[in-house]
Amino acid sequence: MEAAGNARTSTVGAQEHAWARVLWDFHTAPATDDGQGGPKGDIVLALGSHDVRVAHHAARLWRRGAAPLVVFSGDRGRRTGGGDGHRRWARSEAEVFAEASGLPPEAVLLEDRATNTGQNFSCARRLCQERGIGVRTAVATAKPYMARRALASAAVHWPGVTWAFNAFGGGYEGYTDDEHRPEELIAFLVGDLQRLAVYAERGWSAPVEVPPQVREAYAALVDAGFTAHLVSSAPTLPW
């Protein structure tokens, strides 16, 4: 999906962090916690990206018995495909994640065609059907702030399955590090909120109600210049 790549450099101060936390809390709200053993399913579906912490968490889910099989899904996306000045990954996200997970081969299924979130679900669904793997309940894992968008995508692209979402911990403050900068995280939070509205309008995901205070924080961050991850062909304020 196209994105607006020419956003101006933005400063992250206390106010920007406060707005971003509003978006973070909204995006991550559907995620299950790890109490009482955490969610369980027929598979764990790990959505590919540039963040290998997702692979590490998928391995943790498998080791604690969340599911007997982990499906790693993803070819290359914009970033892992070399977009925005990033180094192109030599292998698919699914392959990189599987290796990073350290899981035994019999616990892993690779889906290496998907290039977006909807395809993560539709391609994994097709692969499981081809392999005769019955899926009635499943656990999706991805970057924490993708909880709402992942579940909204699953509702359209893999209906008939009871989905839970679980991701690595740390919260808003613990997400960023030398490789994952605050300004980039905020741009992703902004872009994913826009996508909830835009993709539902296009029939790519289920509708999600966005409360007024979340829309207000989003608009403030757009005005502050955190627009690098917005869909360029869609309205900046889609509500």
Residue positions per predicted region:
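A structural signal for short, hydrophobic/glycine-enriched beta-strand patches
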Residues: 1-189, 239
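A conserved mid-domain beta-alpha-beta active-site/ligand-binding segment of alpha/beta enzyme cores
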Residues: 176-236
